[in-house]
Amino acid sequence: MNQPIAPAPVPNRFAALLARAGLDWFLLALFGVVALAYFLPDLGSKASPVPWKLITTVGVALVFFFYGLKLSLEKLRAGMRNWKLHLLVQATTFVLFPLLALLVRPFFGPEKGELLWQSIFFLCALPSTVSTSVVMVSIARGNMPAAIFNASISSLLGIVLTPLLASLFLHLSADSSQLWGLAVQLLWQVVLPVGAGVLLNSRFNAFAERHKSKLRTFDQVTILLIVFTAFCESFAEGIFSSYRPADVFKLGAGMVGLYIIIVALIWALSRVLNFPRADKIVAVFCGSKKSLVHGSVMASLLFPASAATGLILLPLMLYHALQIVLASSMAQWLGRQPEAQVAAA
């Protein structure tokens, strides 16, 4: 007697649609925790019995320790030679982005406008992503060693340059003792964990590679906790009460404009420098990205007692979502184009 044939599994159309759009569970969870913070602000605020500060502090240190553990020094050495490309990417990340933020400063009014501008400048002072940049370059068939080098170096430079730019232009504190305290906190939570990870890299890099997906999930969960507690504090203190939905929409439109301007400028400079196709792709994808990992942890370090940290993170969250959607679409398009056509563009 014939056994009944089991029905074929129905494909998850929603998941497939999200994947084609460049979205994943983390991006949805990111906005989900903001919604949760809106409805339950006391759960993640300072008044909560849960020791969120201790949890996120340990999480930040572990994120940077695992980053050092995963850092491939051999791949970094392999990508060092193309200095013009590296200079363009790092100058875009830490010079061009902040300059654009400074140029639009006169358009922001006092009080709430100033705080919104500070959040945009903070975004512009951040380093590039590592994993997303490299994945996009791979899809677009770019120079992988150069992508790994630039994304990794950008993250390392960001440990120093992001706090430096923030202290110069955001006037974090005029009190030298508080600035010294910030330096010590950065040393303990960022520099030393990265250094420890690099020192143990040769012995435990294989372990980090085997558990790469789990470590990535740990990074993402840490970010979600930081974002949740930041927005809980902001909602509890009424930071967003003076902002309308139209303000958020304008901010989102501004992030789209920022991304398009940056990509256009990088592509134009790549043509002027006569980069080959593979290097143009690296310049565009590594130079236009901003790291949500670094942004979240740096915000928790640079604005530890501020109820406005949620607002500080808002442009970064919007830009992060846009860069994933727009960059994934662009990477897939470039990956399908003949090399000669992209090189001539």
Please name every model-derived segment.
Residues N2-E111, S167, H171-R277, P338, ...:
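Structural signature of multi-pass alpha-helical membrane transport proteins
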Residues K46-A47, G238-P245, A299-M317:
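Extracellular/periplasmic helix-loop-helix junctions in multi-pass membrane proteins
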Residues A78-G79, S131-N143, S242, A268-R271, ...:
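Helix-loop junctions at the membrane interface of multi-pass solute transporters
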Residues W83-Q90, E111-A125, G142-S152, F249-G252, ...:
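The feature identifies polytopic integral membrane transport proteins across all domains of life
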Residues R105-L161, L170-L182:
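Membrane-interface helix-loop-helix junctions at boundaries between adjacent transmembrane segments
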Residues H211-F218, F275-S291, V297-M298:
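Helix-helix packing/entry segments at the starts of transmembrane helices
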Residues A305-A307, H320-L322, P338-A345:
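Long, low-complexity C-terminal extensions of enzymes
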